[in-house]
Amino acid sequence: VPAHEIGQCVVNELRRYGVDTKYLLRGGPRLGVYYCEKGASQRASKVIYDRAGSSIATAKAEEFDWDGIFEGADWFHWTGITPALGGEMPEACLQACKAAKEKGVTVSCDLNYRKKLWSREQAGEVMAKLLPYVDVCIANEEDAKDVFGIEAENTDINSGKLDHAGYISVARQIAQRFGCRKVAITLRGSLSASDNDWAGMLYDACLLYTSDAA
Protein backbone atom coordinates (compact mmCIF):
# COMPACT_ATOMS: atom_id res chain seq x y z
CA VAL A 1 0.00 0.00 0.00
CA PRO A 2 1.19 3.61 -0.49
CA ALA A 3 3.14 5.26 2.31
CA HIS A 4 0.74 8.19 2.70
CA GLU A 5 -2.29 8.64 4.96
CA ILE A 6 -4.69 6.59 2.83
CA GLY A 7 -2.27 3.68 2.91
CA GLN A 8 -1.96 4.06 6.67
CA CYS A 9 -5.76 3.86 6.97
CA VAL A 10 -5.57 0.44 5.31
CA VAL A 11 -2.85 -0.67 7.73
CA ASN A 12 -4.85 0.57 10.71
CA GLU A 13 -7.99 -1.23 9.55
CA LEU A 14 -6.10 -4.52 9.22
CA ARG A 15 -4.54 -4.11 12.66
CA ARG A 16 -7.99 -3.44 14.07
CA TYR A 17 -8.88 -7.05 13.30
CA GLY A 18 -5.63 -8.47 14.61
CA VAL A 19 -3.92 -8.90 11.23
CA ASP A 20 -0.11 -8.82 11.44
CA THR A 21 1.17 -6.09 9.10
CA LYS A 22 4.87 -6.64 9.77
CA TYR A 23 5.62 -7.67 6.19
CA LEU A 24 3.18 -5.33 4.46
CA LEU A 25 5.11 -3.31 1.87
CA ARG A 26 4.77 0.48 1.82
CA GLY A 27 5.40 2.37 -1.40
CA GLY A 28 4.01 3.19 -4.81
CA PRO A 29 1.84 6.14 -5.85
CA ARG A 30 -1.73 5.14 -5.06
CA LEU A 31 -4.20 2.63 -3.69
CA GLY A 32 -6.10 0.63 -6.30
CA VAL A 33 -9.89 0.94 -6.09
CA TYR A 34 -12.98 -0.22 -7.93
CA TYR A 35 -16.57 0.97 -8.05
CA CYS A 36 -19.70 -1.17 -8.20
CA GLU A 37 -23.00 -0.04 -9.67
CA LYS A 38 -25.57 -2.42 -8.25
CA GLY A 39 -27.95 -4.04 -10.69
CA ALA A 40 -31.71 -4.17 -10.37
CA SER A 41 -34.22 -6.75 -11.57
CA GLN A 42 -32.73 -8.20 -14.80
CA ARG A 43 -30.08 -5.46 -15.19
CA ALA A 44 -26.72 -6.84 -14.07
CA SER A 45 -24.37 -5.05 -11.69
CA LYS A 46 -21.47 -3.15 -13.27
CA VAL A 47 -17.91 -2.90 -11.96
CA ILE A 48 -15.43 -0.15 -12.91
CA TYR A 49 -11.78 -0.81 -12.07
CA ASP A 50 -9.35 2.00 -11.25
CA ARG A 51 -6.17 0.08 -10.49
CA ALA A 52 -3.70 1.31 -13.12
CA GLY A 53 -0.45 2.46 -11.52
CA SER A 54 -1.45 1.25 -8.05
CA SER A 55 1.10 0.27 -5.42
CA ILE A 56 0.51 -3.46 -5.86
CA ALA A 57 0.59 -3.23 -9.66
CA THR A 58 3.97 -1.47 -9.62
CA ALA A 59 5.58 -3.57 -6.86
CA LYS A 60 8.68 -5.62 -7.69
CA ALA A 61 8.70 -9.38 -7.16
CA GLU A 62 11.99 -9.31 -5.23
CA GLU A 63 10.60 -6.87 -2.65
CA PHE A 64 8.62 -9.58 -0.85
CA ASP A 65 10.32 -11.50 1.98
CA TRP A 66 8.54 -14.81 1.45
CA ASP A 67 10.76 -16.73 3.87
CA GLY A 68 9.81 -14.32 6.63
CA ILE A 69 6.17 -14.11 5.59
CA PHE A 70 5.69 -17.89 5.66
CA GLU A 71 7.64 -18.52 8.86
CA GLY A 72 5.18 -20.21 11.22
CA ALA A 73 2.35 -20.03 8.67
CA ASP A 74 0.20 -23.03 7.78
CA TRP A 75 -1.99 -21.65 4.98
CA PHE A 76 -1.43 -19.25 2.06
CA HIS A 77 -4.36 -18.03 -0.03
CA TRP A 78 -4.09 -15.97 -3.19
CA THR A 79 -6.58 -14.89 -5.83
CA GLY A 80 -6.43 -14.84 -9.62
CA ILE A 81 -6.97 -11.09 -9.51
CA THR A 82 -3.43 -10.54 -8.20
CA PRO A 83 -1.46 -11.81 -11.23
CA ALA A 84 -4.05 -10.12 -13.46
CA LEU A 85 -2.82 -6.73 -12.20
CA GLY A 86 0.19 -7.12 -14.48
CA GLY A 87 3.72 -5.86 -14.00
CA GLU A 88 5.70 -8.33 -11.89
CA MET A 89 2.66 -9.73 -10.09
CA PRO A 90 2.61 -13.04 -12.03
CA GLU A 91 6.25 -13.63 -11.06
CA ALA A 92 5.58 -12.55 -7.47
CA CYS A 93 2.73 -15.06 -7.23
CA LEU A 94 4.94 -17.81 -8.64
CA GLN A 95 7.72 -17.05 -6.15
CA ALA A 96 5.18 -16.99 -3.32
CA CYS A 97 3.73 -20.37 -4.28
CA LYS A 98 7.16 -21.97 -4.56
CA ALA A 99 8.28 -20.54 -1.21
CA ALA A 100 5.06 -21.69 0.46
CA LYS A 101 5.49 -25.25 -0.81
CA GLU A 102 9.10 -25.32 0.38
CA LYS A 103 7.88 -24.31 3.85
CA GLY A 104 5.17 -26.98 3.85
CA VAL A 105 2.41 -24.37 3.76
CA THR A 106 -0.96 -25.34 2.26
CA VAL A 107 -1.69 -23.19 -0.81
CA SER A 108 -5.20 -22.27 -1.92
CA CYS A 109 -6.33 -20.18 -4.87
CA ASP A 110 -9.57 -18.63 -6.10
CA LEU A 111 -9.43 -18.44 -9.92
CA ASN A 112 -11.51 -15.23 -9.89
CA TYR A 113 -11.17 -14.47 -13.62
CA ARG A 114 -11.88 -10.82 -14.50
CA LYS A 115 -12.07 -10.08 -18.22
CA LYS A 116 -11.61 -6.35 -17.60
CA LEU A 117 -8.14 -7.03 -16.16
CA TRP A 118 -6.72 -9.53 -18.68
CA SER A 119 -7.63 -11.73 -21.62
CA ARG A 120 -8.57 -15.40 -21.46
CA GLU A 121 -5.33 -16.27 -23.23
CA GLN A 122 -3.21 -14.35 -20.72
CA ALA A 123 -5.09 -15.83 -17.78
CA GLY A 124 -4.79 -19.38 -19.11
CA GLU A 125 -1.06 -19.07 -19.72
CA VAL A 126 -0.24 -17.57 -16.32
CA MET A 127 -2.62 -19.63 -14.20
CA ALA A 128 -1.44 -22.87 -15.80
CA LYS A 129 2.03 -22.13 -14.39
CA LEU A 130 0.68 -21.38 -10.92
CA LEU A 131 -1.95 -24.08 -10.38
CA PRO A 132 0.56 -26.97 -10.04
CA TYR A 133 1.59 -25.40 -6.70
CA VAL A 134 -2.01 -25.15 -5.46
CA ASP A 135 -3.46 -27.67 -3.00
CA VAL A 136 -7.00 -26.26 -2.88
CA CYS A 137 -8.52 -24.61 -5.96
CA ILE A 138 -11.72 -22.57 -5.65
CA ALA A 139 -13.60 -21.95 -8.88
CA ASN A 140 -16.96 -21.72 -10.60
CA GLU A 141 -18.17 -22.95 -13.97
CA GLU A 142 -17.47 -19.63 -15.72
CA ASP A 143 -13.89 -19.33 -14.44
CA ALA A 144 -13.08 -22.93 -15.37
CA LYS A 145 -14.31 -22.33 -18.91
CA ASP A 146 -12.76 -18.88 -19.38
CA VAL A 147 -9.34 -19.71 -17.96
CA PHE A 148 -8.83 -23.38 -18.87
CA GLY A 149 -11.53 -24.19 -21.41
CA ILE A 150 -13.07 -26.71 -19.02
CA GLU A 151 -16.86 -26.82 -19.30
CA ALA A 152 -19.59 -28.20 -17.05
CA GLU A 153 -21.66 -30.67 -19.05
CA ASN A 154 -25.45 -30.21 -19.22
CA THR A 155 -25.16 -26.74 -17.69
CA ASP A 156 -26.29 -23.45 -19.20
CA ILE A 157 -24.40 -20.58 -17.54
CA ASN A 158 -26.60 -17.90 -19.07
CA SER A 159 -29.87 -19.45 -17.92
CA GLY A 160 -28.54 -20.23 -14.46
CA LYS A 161 -29.31 -23.94 -14.89
CA LEU A 162 -27.29 -26.08 -12.50
CA ASP A 163 -26.34 -29.72 -13.00
CA HIS A 164 -24.16 -31.14 -10.24
CA ALA A 165 -22.94 -34.03 -12.38
CA GLY A 166 -21.37 -31.54 -14.79
CA TYR A 167 -19.47 -29.85 -12.00
CA ILE A 168 -18.02 -33.14 -10.83
CA SER A 169 -16.41 -33.42 -14.25
CA VAL A 170 -15.05 -29.85 -13.98
CA ALA A 171 -13.57 -30.52 -10.54
CA ARG A 172 -12.05 -33.82 -11.65
CA GLN A 173 -10.44 -32.24 -14.72
CA ILE A 174 -8.90 -29.41 -12.69
CA ALA A 175 -7.58 -31.86 -10.09
CA GLN A 176 -6.13 -34.21 -12.68
CA ARG A 177 -4.61 -31.52 -14.89
CA PHE A 178 -2.85 -29.60 -12.11
CA GLY A 179 -2.60 -32.05 -9.22
CA CYS A 180 -4.82 -30.09 -6.82
CA ARG A 181 -5.78 -32.15 -3.76
CA LYS A 182 -9.17 -30.46 -3.41
CA VAL A 183 -11.39 -28.44 -5.73
CA ALA A 184 -14.22 -26.30 -4.36
CA ILE A 185 -16.87 -24.96 -6.71
CA THR A 186 -19.52 -22.35 -6.00
CA LEU A 187 -22.87 -23.09 -7.64
CA ARG A 188 -25.07 -20.10 -8.42
CA GLY A 189 -28.61 -20.23 -9.75
CA SER A 190 -29.41 -16.72 -10.98
CA LEU A 191 -32.92 -15.46 -10.22
CA SER A 192 -32.32 -11.75 -10.93
CA ALA A 193 -29.51 -9.17 -10.70
CA SER A 194 -29.88 -9.08 -6.92
CA ASP A 195 -31.21 -12.54 -6.07
CA ASN A 196 -29.39 -15.86 -6.44
CA ASP A 197 -29.55 -19.38 -5.10
CA TRP A 198 -26.12 -20.48 -3.82
CA ALA A 199 -24.68 -23.90 -3.11
CA GLY A 200 -21.19 -25.29 -2.67
CA MET A 201 -19.36 -28.42 -3.75
CA LEU A 202 -16.04 -29.87 -2.57
CA TYR A 203 -14.26 -32.53 -4.61
CA ASP A 204 -11.62 -34.45 -2.66
CA ALA A 205 -9.99 -37.08 -4.88
CA CYS A 206 -12.81 -39.60 -5.32
CA LEU A 207 -15.08 -38.10 -2.64
CA LEU A 208 -17.71 -35.42 -3.24
CA TYR A 209 -19.44 -33.16 -0.73
CA THR A 210 -22.31 -30.81 -1.64
CA SER A 211 -24.48 -28.34 0.23
CA ASP A 212 -28.14 -27.55 -0.31
CA ALA A 213 -28.96 -24.43 -2.33
CA ALA A 214 -29.99 -21.43 -0.27
Which residues are covered by each model-predicted region?
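Short, flexible loop segments at the rims of nucleotide/cofactor-binding pockets, characterized by
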Residues: 53-57, 84-86, 113-118, 159-163
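Conserved phosphate/ATP/ADP-binding segment of small-molecule kinases
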Residues: 117-205
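Conserved N-terminal subdomain of the carbohydrate kinase-like
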Residues: 2-81
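Short beta-strand/loop segments at the ligand-binding rim of alpha/beta enzyme cores
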Residues: 106-108
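Short acidic-glycine loop/turn motifs at beta-strand connectors
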Residues: 39-41, 203-207
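Conserved small/polar residues in nucleotide/adenosyl-binding loops
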Residues: 209-214
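Glycine/threonine-rich flexible loop motifs
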Residues: 82-91, 119, 148
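Catalytic-core regions built around general acid/base machinery
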Residues: 92-102, 126-133
